Amino acid sequence: MNAIHNSQSGNLRDKTLDHDSTQYAALVGIDWGDKEHAFHLKSDDGTFESGTLRHSSETLFQWLSKLEERFGSRPVAFAIEAQSPPLLAAIRQFSWAVVFQIHPITSKRLRTAFTPSGAKDDLPDAKVLLDLLISHRDKLRPLPEPVSPKTRILDGICRERRELVDQRTKWCLQTRAALKAYFPQAFELFSDELFRPIVSKFLARWPDLISLKAEKSSIIKRFYTSNGYRNVALIDQRLEIIKTSIAIEIDPSRISEYTRKVKHILERIELANRQIKELDLQMSTVFKEHENWQFFRELPGAGPSLAPRLLCAINMAPENNAQGMQKYFGTAPVKEKSGSRVWTHRRWNAPRFFHQTWGEWAGLSVQHSRWAKEFYEQAKARGKGRYTALRALAFKWMRVIARCLETKTDYNEELYIQSLKKRRSPLAQHL
């Protein structure tokens, strides 16, 4: 693979500008509601105004167009809470709009600081957001320019796939619980994960032990062989299990209840399998439309599902330098001090999906990278828990990847190990 090209995923830069010194034509705080949206506005001449907008895209776009005409397309800063994606989508269609996305906890704490009674109203909430822009803009970071549509599409596919996998896992656990209650021998009859097609076929044909024991051994044996089983000794062992098994549940009403439940859950699992397969095809296609897809695909342990997630994570981060990535993705620790007490903990408000992506990939990289395995084992030997060790490993990986993207070179395991030895890193002693 040749050296990676300079594209969005390889362009190592701070994706935000210095908006602290920007002269805005107006500052606007908007509180998103179900039926209407409240706003507070301060123009550059010092005047304030407030109002509400009916919940409709037409009303919102009409209002934004009036702001564009009123301020002559000069920059206008908007403060909105992070939980209002439709509002964000509308505002970002105007090139003069600069969006500061406020975490709900931030606005809540500022509101309660001045209203300890707990009173809450949309107009005051919009004013709180405006106050943050007026008094604390130096501590806020504007949203970076939107990433390319194909990256957003890929990110959506990755997230949808993960949701389906999580849902399928939940259904598999429900199936396992039901089988334990009336047909525990099933777990000895197939070693596959419960979402595998052979499990659905098996339980659709023999949903309980009674129907299975009534079947001829030759037919059961043919079922195994026709579904890819070639180990004759294993098949004979399972036939013997069937022959000697005793049903734990013989009440027809209870068996009917359990088999019906398992049937319906397996139907959902089969549908999820088909949907995941479709998403895998779409994900592969869109992933390969990105110029640097091979760079991510060849990272140790980054398979067909994790490599696209890593690409999206880096492309959608506000900054692609190592320190910015480590903070944004939540691998950089936070130190708190109160009096004589000092403690360190992980960052709580990192983007969950991206944080999860880095943790999962770090775990897989241990199986495919010599130095990553050594790093993980040394961390465990120092008493670190699994997730703390993986988070530290992800922290390390971000430095490596950021450097590769900065220099526009591919990751090379052997070259990196040589670098560790040259620097006399503690990792190099056992490599």
What does each model-found stretch correspond to?
Residues 1-431:
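A detector of single, family-specific signature residues
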